[in-house]
């Protein structure tokens, strides 16, 4: 094994919630998902992960995994993204991931428009746009402590910390 792969492995061991054996199992899983052997997972390959294609937020999840905005998820991004869902990640990590789902433009805030877009993805046509906009406006108004019209991570965290958001972001999976 060369120094580059072992450096990557050491970085993953330091930066994620996985041990060496788990990373190796995930590497094998990644290689199966990477059907064209490109070294990264494209959107179609990502959608083939069990349970992902049925998730309305699958596209946003992939965008959050894709830390370098390349349009594909490489092995390091795959492991880093999955690490958040492990039972060993803390509530703060899970909430930060959830925040990133809403923070579409990655500016560190959830705007009214971003909240609307993500909630629209989740509710589909079950709510009229006007009703959904009322929910969005009320959510921002009730949780925007500093009055800047958008939610910071701390404001988001305060709004959701009493909910089961963090628990729902834990996967009990056989990796």
Curated annotation (Swiss-Prot):
Q: Which GO terms describe its molecular function?
A: calcium ion binding; calcium-dependent protein serine/threonine phosphatase activity; calcium-dependent protein serine/threonine phosphatase regulator activity; phosphatase binding
InterPro entries for the chain: EF-hand-dom_pair, EF_Hand_1_Ca_BS, EF_hand_dom
Q: What is the organism lineage in this UniProt record? A: Eukaryota, Fungi, Dikarya, Ascomycota, Saccharomycotina
GO BP term, pick one: intracellular monoatomic ion homeostasis
PROSITE patterns per the UniProt record, alphabetical: EF_HAND_1, EF_HAND_2
Indicate what this protein is called per its UniProt record.
Answer: Calcineurin subunit B
Tell me the residue numbers annotated for binding Ca(2+) 3.
103, 105, 107, 109, 114
Cellular component terms (Gene Ontology): calcineurin complex
């Amino acid at each position: 094994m060369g120094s580059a792969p072992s450096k990557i492995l050491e970085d993953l061991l330091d930066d994620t919630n996985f041990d060496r054996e788990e990373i190796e199992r995930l590497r094998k899983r990644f290689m199966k998902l990477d059907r064209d052997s490109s070294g990264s997972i494209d959107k179609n390959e990502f959608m083939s992960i069990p349970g992902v294609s049925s998730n309305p937020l699958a596209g946003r999840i992939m965008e959050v995994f894709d830390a370098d905005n390349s349009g594909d998820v490489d092995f390091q991004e795959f492991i880093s993204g999955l690490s958040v869902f492990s039972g060993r990640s803390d509530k703060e990590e899970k909430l930060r991931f959830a925040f990133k789902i809403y923070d579409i433009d990655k500016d560190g805030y959830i705007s009214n428009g971003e909240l609307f877009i993500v909630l629209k993805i989740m509710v589909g046509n079950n709510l009229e746009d006007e009703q959904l906009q009322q929910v969005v406006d009320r959510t921002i108004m009730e949780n925007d402590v500093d009055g800047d019209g958008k939610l910071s991570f701390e404001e988001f965290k305060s709004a959701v910390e009493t909910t089961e958001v963090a628990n729902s972001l834990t996967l009990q999976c056989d990796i």
